């Protein structure tokens, strides 16, 4: 899985709502693309605007980066002041099995998961 994370702050020219509206427009089309696992946008209490895309594979993300939709995303980013952009390449995903493993007492081998 590959995750794109964007965070930006409002500028004197564009408000947080302006950025959020632009991102929401992208979310609708992005979610329909093959290989997209999810796409969302939101604003937190300090007015930072967040945009996240998750893709099944790196080839899916590469296809996305070459798309017209991504060109629209780049145009939004160019209107922001120092947007933070990060690509995370997730190679392992685990669930509660990891919690059980991590909480197992090494000396006894007993799991220490409380199920109250």
Tell where the protein language model's regions lie, with residue ranges.
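Short, flexible helix/strand-to-coil boundary loops that buttress conserved ligand/catalytic motifs
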Residues: 53, 64-65, 74-77
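Short S/T/G/P-rich N-terminal loop/turn motif that feeds into the first structured element of a domain
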Residues: 1-49, 56-68, 82-116
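Outer-membrane beta-barrel domain signature
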Residues: 72-79, 89
